[in-house]
Swiss-Prot record:
<dbReference type="InterPro" id="IPR018163">
    <property type="entry name" value="Thr/Ala-tRNA-synth_IIc_edit"/>
</dbReference>
<dbReference type="InterPro" id="IPR012676">
    <property type="entry name" value="TGS-like"/>
</dbReference>
<feature type="binding site">
    <location>
        <position position="510"/>
    </location>
    <ligand>
        <name>Zn(2+)</name>
    </ligand>
</feature>
<dbReference type="InterPro" id="IPR036621">
    <property type="entry name" value="Anticodon-bd_dom_sf"/>
</dbReference>
<keyword id="KW-0694">RNA-binding</keyword>
<dbReference type="Pfam" id="PF03129">
    <property type="entry name" value="HGTP_anticodon"/>
</dbReference>
<dbReference type="InterPro" id="IPR002320">
    <property type="entry name" value="Thr-tRNA-ligase_IIa"/>
</dbReference>
<keyword id="KW-0030">Aminoacyl-tRNA synthetase</keyword>
<dbReference type="InterPro" id="IPR047246">
    <property type="entry name" value="ThrRS_anticodon"/>
</dbReference>
<feature type="region of interest" description="Catalytic">
    <location>
        <begin position="242"/>
        <end position="533"/>
    </location>
</feature>
<comment type="similarity">
    <text>Belongs to the class-II aminoacyl-tRNA synthetase family.</text>
</comment>
<keyword id="KW-0479">Metal-binding</keyword>
<feature type="binding site">
    <location>
        <position position="384"/>
    </location>
    <ligand>
        <name>Zn(2+)</name>
    </ligand>
</feature>
<dbReference type="InterPro" id="IPR012947">
    <property type="entry name" value="tRNA_SAD"/>
</dbReference>
<dbReference type="InterPro" id="IPR045864">
    <property type="entry name" value="aa-tRNA-synth_II/BPL/LPL"/>
</dbReference>
<dbReference type="InterPro" id="IPR004154">
    <property type="entry name" value="Anticodon-bd"/>
</dbReference>
<keyword id="KW-0963">Cytoplasm</keyword>
Length: 638
């Protein structure tokens, strides 16, 4: 009979099989009431799960991320239940958990309105108050297919029909509502008390634009009301900071239907782009990288050799010329190996650090595109380091140190790190993996960096480190990557002559700090709400005259500032000064310089910083020195 080992190491023995719920009750009434699910030998299960053999067990409550996931998954089913009661003709499809919430896709004859969402949310609350028991059932696949067909749920029947016939399927029942799901779920709808439907959007069935357009209802669910209110406040703030809105307001960029997923950079937006790219260019050159440039379009044969044709062909834009097939490159790495392969390489040439601001194209589904955050044409701060096995740790440590400095310069100081290790299916020897994983861990440890270990989550060709930054709204953005690769140098014949005079394959380190420059600029815009630090701002300041009598002096001030290297505009319109100040404040310029008769007579300038801060009068040389220090320090505030 089962001996249950709890997280604190204590063991509870039973003389008969027990459910997770019964184990929770044996520990205490409070835990039994708080329990949402269980974790048996590392696997999440329902409270009704029957334990018949010795096993470790943790009771899952609302206090951890796993408990929140169970709540959100169950709330997605509650949403579908409510929709089916209110709109019986709607067909259900899928409803997964996503970051901070969930969604559910429906097929319905007309778009859901905001009023519909209010009704659905109200019905969800009613179903929750009824405390309907939620139970798991296991059916033969064919029985489940026939059942959902009989209910008119053709999408759900299609999903189940794709499961191998010999496999049983897991269904969850709450009242009259039944849905396909692996689970686990809360034991009763009464556990679902804090939720909110947030929006409705379109989504293609199975993510394919050739299929029907469905309606995706998004929602969020939490354990506590305060958490929900904080999250909704964050959403409100995120809406104000939406880079798409600010991109229009600040005249940075636009995207139009004729070029989906491609960015039209306006002059101010391109100035911002140049500041980011030029900063990164100086940074990599100062750290021993050589910058290269490779072709945009490459013969299909190279992508077949590299393995990308098999893995990425659906995401690749292709073309033909003179009976040859070409692909627009979705990544730079195979092309960088072509440069490495030109001429014999020696161990003395390693490490070789090769960087490119490479323009890549990927045929992302149209439904996945999102402003400049998710596009089809993007530029990466991409680099590849070719090195010997014994150089991996040193190169990894140098990269990690560089990455931290770059993020700090852009105003991000909180970095989350994940180290992903060998999967079951992999290339390379165990000795190679042991050494590579140890080198990456040692590089992180040497700098005292905390990281989450992700066993089995590495790529088949090598372990990797992922770096995510937190913005001012505590949103997490995965940007940086350090990926070891034992595979591609072998596939593409990259070799060097080692000290033993034999040819060896180098280890290839794929690395990026910003990732997509488009996406990173979108993150910057939202992080700073468009009020970019002086060194990044497309326009540093505008010079404003109070009346026509100061036009000549204002023009001279603007000229001297431009001559000193600053990006300055002059607004000499015959408008009231308060009107001009308000207008330019909307555009979030770091500084406004006001020129009146007093300033002209004294040969000084009156300076206003962003946010209406009056810095008073000062000589122009003093202002120039102030700005130079601010730019050099790359200081900025949220």
């Amino acid at each position: 009979m089962p001996n249950i080992t709890l997280p604190d190491g204590s063991v509870r023995s039973f003389d008969h099989p027990v459910t997770v719920s019964e184990v929770a009750s044996s520990i205490g009434a409070g835990l039994a009431k708080a329990a949402l699910a269980g974790k048996v030998d590392g696997r999440l299960v329902d409270l009704s799960y029957r334990i018949e053999a010795d096993t470790p067990l943790a009771i899952v409550t609302e206090k951890g991320d796993e408990g929140l996931d169970v709540i959100r998954h169950s709330t997605a089913h509650l949403l579908a239940h409510a929709v089916k009661e209110l709109f019986p003709e709607a067909q259900v499809t899928i409803g997964p958990v996503i970051e901070n919430g969930f969604y559910y896709d429906f097929a319905y004859k007309r778009p859901f309105t905001p009023e519909d969402l209010e009704k659905i949310e109200k019905r969800m609350a009613e179903l929750a108050r009824r405390e309907i028991p939620v139970s798991r059932e296991v059916w033969p696949r064919d029985k489940a297919v026939e059942f959902f067909k009989s209910q008119g749920e053709h999408y759900k029947a299609e999903i189940i029909a794709s499961i191998p016939q010999a496999e049983d399927v897991s269904l969850y029942r709450q009242g009259d509502f039944i849905d396909l799901c692996r689970g686990p779920h809360v034991p009763s709808t009464g556990k679902l008390k804090v939720f909110k439907l947030t929006k409705v959007a379109g989504a293609y069935w199975r993510g394919d634009s050739k299929n029907e357009m469905l309606q995706r209802i998004y929602g969020t669910a939490w354990a506590k009301k305060d958490d929900l209110e904080n999250y909704l406040h964050m959403l409100e703030e995120a809406e104000k900071r939406d880079h798409r809105k600010l991109g229009r307001l600040l005249d940075l960029f636009h995207i139009q239907e004729e070029a989906p997923g491609m960015v039209f950079w306006h002059a101010k937006g391109w100035t911002l782009w140049q500041q980011v790219e030029q900063y990164m260019r100086r940074t990599i050159l100062d750290n021993g990288y050589q910058e290269v440039k490779t072709p945009q379009i490459v013969d299909r044969s190279l992508w077949e050799k590299s393995g990308h044709w098999d893995m990425y062909s659906e995401l690749m834009f292709t073309t033909q010329s003179e009976k040859r097939d070409y692909a627009v490159k979705p990544m730079n790495c195979p092309c960088h190996i072509q440069i490495f392969n030109q001429g014999l390489k020696s161990y003395r040439d390693l490490p070789l650090r090769m960087a490119e601001f490479g323009s890549c194209h990927r045929n992302e589904p149209s439904g996945a595109l999102h402003g400049i955050m998710r596009v089809r044409n993007f530029v990466q701060d991409d680099a590849h380091i070719f090195c010997a096995d014994e150089q991996v740790q040193t190169e990894a440590a140098a990269f990690i140190e560089l990455l931290q400095k770059v993020y700090a310069d852009f105003g991000f100081t909180e970095i989350l790190i994940k180290l992903s290790t060998r999967p079951d299916k992999r290339v390379g020897t165990d000795d190679q993996w042991d050494a590579a994983e140890a080198a990456l861990a040692a590089a992180l440890d040497a700098q005292g960096l905390a990281y989450d270990l992700q066993p089995g989550e590495g790529a088949f060709y090598g372990p990797k480190i992922e770096f995510s930054l937190k913005d001012c709204l505590n949103r997490v953005w995965q940007c940086g990557t350090l990926q070891l690769d034992f595979n591609l140098p072998v596939r593409l014949g990259a070799e060097y002559v080692a000290e033993d005079n034999a040819k060896h394959y180098p280890v290839m380190l794929h690395r990026a700090i910003l990732g997509s420059l488009e996406r990173f600029i979108g993150i910057l815009i939202e992080h700073y709400a468009g009020a970019l630090p002086l060194w990044l701002a497309p326009v540093h300041a505008v010079v404003l005259n109070i009346s026509e009598g100061q036009t000549d002096y204002a023009t001279e001030v603007a000229r001297r500032l431009k001559q000193a290297g600053f990006r300055v505009e002059a607004d000499l319109r015959n408008e009231k000064i308060n009107y001009k100040i308000r207008e330019h404040s909307v555009h979030k310029l770091p500084y406004q310089i006001v020129i009146g008769e007093k300033e002209k007579a004294a040969g000084v300038v009156a300076v206003r910083a962003r946010g209406g801060q009056d810095l008073g009068q000062m000589p122009l040389d003093t202002l120039i020195e102030r700005w130079q220090r601010e730019i050099e320090a790359r200081s900025g505030s949220i």
